[in-house]
């Protein structure tokens, strides 16, 4: 039985995973520190180079020397001497006074005011300084990179082809959009011109549209003439439905035969009347007996054709399937109270559901906290097993630890 290298089980062994990880982390940390130090050194070198270049430019005269507010901290005792103090009788060091005079005497040579200094080649240095400034400008570097990228794109035929295709697609989309807008404008203009021809057909079309919207939005309740009740279309008087459908058909026939409105207006009126005819046909009417006999309908058609009554048409439009009577103030108040009660009930239901979910979440979090504690989960499982097990199970589990008799000692001790 070989246990392998026992040194690998020691905490100090260098080949264990933990020690290898520690070494790797220390190396990474050392490498990061080294990179940071190199970066700081590089920044210091660049800053020193900039300061030297600035100082050189100020010495040559290419750049105006800026007045720093903290120069007095770096000046010697001679820089803080005030000459007016001598006039006021205050003592001034003679050495400092001489130094200041020497500095003033040598100022002309430093600033280039000596005879013949105007012919000194100072322009080249200023040009070099300006060129170095332009090269180090970050905005100039960004512009240069952008120009290089543009040049690469222009020199690459594949990219140029893709760009041309994209431009062509965008132009085609714009042209299609313009064509659609032109067609829409033309259609609107045509519709306005046709609507100006027949004012009566326009009124009927608007009424039909409003009735269609009301019928689609909610189940229609229409008022039966002579009663104050509101009933559904399916429970309405079937004879009234049949008569209304016949009268609409007669009206359509008379309107189609009349030659007063223009051609396109009559087409639109027939198109708008068709959905009204479809709405008037309810399932109860389909299941009823067929229409009255043909002679009777022909008489009615003849009468309607000879003398059309506008009052009857207005009554039919008013009592069509989409018409509802105006509610009184009491009914409006009652509906408002019902809506408020419904909203209150919904708010209570929402709060109850939120509370229930909050209780469930709290119970889950509590169970998770109990399970996450060390030993609590096993303790709970032991309690559950103890509560469900019987006395026989406990005796069988402890059978090997029970005291044996003399008969059991005489038997083979290896057997169980």
Curated annotation (Swiss-Prot):
Modified residue annotations for Phosphoserine: 170, 222
Composition skew (Basic residues), residue ranges: 175-193, 277-300
Region (Disordered): 164-343
A Gene Ontology biological process term: mRNA splicing, via spliceosome
Pfam families reported in the protein's UniProt record: Cir_N, CWC25
One cellular component term from this protein's GO annotations in UniProt: nuclear speck
Protein's cellular compartments: Nucleus
Composition-biased stretches (Basic and acidic residues): 301-316, 327-343
Glycyl lysine isopeptide (Lys-Gly) (interchain with G-Cter in SUMO2) crosslink site(s): 382
Keyword field: Coiled coil, Isopeptide bond, mRNA processing, mRNA splicing, Nucleus, Phosphoprotein, Spliceosome, Ubl conjugation
Coiled-coil region(s): 20-70, 324-413
Entries under InterPro entries matching the protein: CIR_N_dom, CWC25, CWC25_splicing_factor
Family: Belongs to the CWC25 family.
Annotated function: Involved in pre-mRNA splicing as component of the spliceosome.
Name of the protein in question: Pre-mRNA-splicing factor CWC25 homolog
């Amino acid at each position: 039985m070989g246990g392998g290298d026992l040194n690998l089980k020691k905490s100090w062994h260098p080949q264990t995973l933990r020690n290898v990880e520690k070494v790797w982390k220390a190396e990474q940390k050392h490498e990061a520190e080294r990179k940071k130090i190199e970066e700081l050194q590089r920044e210091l070198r660049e800053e020193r180079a900039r300061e030297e270049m600035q100082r050189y430019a100020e010495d040559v005269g290419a750049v105006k020397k800026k007045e720093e507010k903290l120069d007095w901290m770096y000046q010697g005792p001679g820089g803080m001497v005030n000459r007016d103090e001598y006039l006021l009788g205050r003592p001034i060091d003679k050495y400092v006074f001489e130094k200041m005079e020497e500095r003033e005497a040598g100022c002309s040579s430093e600033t280039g005011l000596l005879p013949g200094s105007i012919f000194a080649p100072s322009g080249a240095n200023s040009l070099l300084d300006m060129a170095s400034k332009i090269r180090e400008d970050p905005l100039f570097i960004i512009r240069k990179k952008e120009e290089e990228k543009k040049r690469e794109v222009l020199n690459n035929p594949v990219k140029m082809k893709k760009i041309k295709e994209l431009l062509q697609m965008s132009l085609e989309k714009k042209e299609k959009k313009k064509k659609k807008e032109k067609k829409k404008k033309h259609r609107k203009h045509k519709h306005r011109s046709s609507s100006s021809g027949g004012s009566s057909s326009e009124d009927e079309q608007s009424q039909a549209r409003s009735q269609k919207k009301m019928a689609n939005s909610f189940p229609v309740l229409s008022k039966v003439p002579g009663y104050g009740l509101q009933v559904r279309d399916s429970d309405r008087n079937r004879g009234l439905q049949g008569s209304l459908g016949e009268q609409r058909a007669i009206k359509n026939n008379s309107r189609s035969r009349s030659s007063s409105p223009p051609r396109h207006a009559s087409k639109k009126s027939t198109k708008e009347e068709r959905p009204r005819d479809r709405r008037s046909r309810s399932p109860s009417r389909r299941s009823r007996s067929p229409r009255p006999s043909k002679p009777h309908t022909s008489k009615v058609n003849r009468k309607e054709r000879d003398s059309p009554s506008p009052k009857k048409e207005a009554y039919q439009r008013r009592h069509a399937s989409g018409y509802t009577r105006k509610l009184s103030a009491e009914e409006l108040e009652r509906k408002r109270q019902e809506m408020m009660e419904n909203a209150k009930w919904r708010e209570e239901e929402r709060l109850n559901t939120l509370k229930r979910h909050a209780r469930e979440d709290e119970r889950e979090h509590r169970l998770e906290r109990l399970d996450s504690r060390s030993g609590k989960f096993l303790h709970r499982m032991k309690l559950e097993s103890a509560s469900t097990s019987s006395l026989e199970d406990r005796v069988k589990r402890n059978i090997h630890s029970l005291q044996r008799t003399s008969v059991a000692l005489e038997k083979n001790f290896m057997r169980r």
